[in-house]
Amino acid sequence: MTPSSSGLEQSEIDAIQELEQTSRNDTLLKYHDICIDEGVIEQDVDMSCFSANSVGEWIVELIYQNNIKKLIMGATADSHYSEGMVHITPTKADYVIQHAPHCCNIWLVCNGNLIQTREGRFEHAGSAYSSSSSLHSIDSALIPYGGAGRAERVTEPHALSSSEEQSARGIEKMYYEEQRRRLEIEELKREKEQRDKMRRVREEALSSSSGVTKILYNEEVMRRREVEAELNRAKAEIEDMKRVQIELKEQHYADCRLLEKERDEAIKTTEELLRALEKGESSIPLQWSVSIEPPQCFICPISKDIMQNPHVAADGYTYEADEFRRWLNHGGEKSPMTNLRLENRNLIPNLVLRSAIKDWLQQHP
């Protein structure tokens, strides 16, 4: 079998040949087991597999090479057996009957029935062989489907012994098992042809304008879905950034208002002190005394010291940058002020507060 002659690819041909080889090996093993079950010494059982253009010619060649005296072979497949069948039709069996050596006894069986026999004839009287005993039991074991007198015999009909009958039935069963396997291989071939046909139809559909349009439409739908999903993720991130920005802006405004209030109070107190000094008052009212305590917004909530580098965290509060990073590095995942989980670890410099702290420190060395 070649790719050009069969229309199959080389890999498919190899697979079919491998399946056939496996089937042949299984059949030979069954033959081997039948021989062993019938008492044949295992060393006397020889299994061989040959490839030939003519099966009948090769069977005859094996008979001559191995000096075979008894041969049981299938006459035809079970599906070809008909009631009242008395003549063989396969070329293989007919060729063996005509060309096998005269000393070989041949029994042709089909579907459990004896179809034809050919007794061996011996030219030397000393080696004369009577097949009556070996053929006696086959008449009772392999009765033709249409009656006892249906089978054609070259000589007087006889029957196989019980063991030979079982062997014949086993060999016939294996022969038809081989046929079944061949049918399975043909079915696989038909299935492959059907798949190839469907593939060609599908390719033709895709090559048509409507098929191409449908494919392009589906691809466009998939791209739009991916873009929409990415856009939704980007919108969600922007909304989160806006929310954080609003919170930071509110905190910034609160700090500015506090600083303005403290500035106004400081200016007012300073003006009162100046007026008191100008009047020459020796004593200054207690409420005029300038507090040397820093404003609470200048104090880091973590270290309780005046901040040098204030930064706004994700919770909206201002911390000393180094102190807050140290807090995070030691496992702090929640806000020191709200005790809520921090959304991120980002810090934003609070430039206004840092400027105010710098001015205050210059006034209070």
Curated annotation (Swiss-Prot):
One of its GO terms (molecular function) is ubiquitin-protein transferase activity. The keyword Transferase applies. Pathway: Protein modification; protein ubiquitination. The keyword Transmembrane does not apply. Signal peptide: none annotated. Its EC number is 2.3.2.27. Residues 176-281 form a coiled coil. Transmembrane segments: none annotated. It catalyses: S-ubiquitinyl-[E2 ubiquitin-conjugating enzyme]-L-cysteine + [acceptor protein]-L-lysine = [E2 ubiquitin-conjugating enzyme]-L-cysteine + N(6)-ubiquitinyl-[acceptor protein]-L-lysine. InterPro entries: U-box_ubiquitin_ligases (IPR051348), Ubox_domain (IPR003613), Znf_RING/FYVE/PHD (IPR013083). Residues 293-365 form the U-box domain. Functions as an E3 ubiquitin ligase. This is U-box domain-containing protein 56. It comes from Arabidopsis thaliana (Mouse-ear cress).
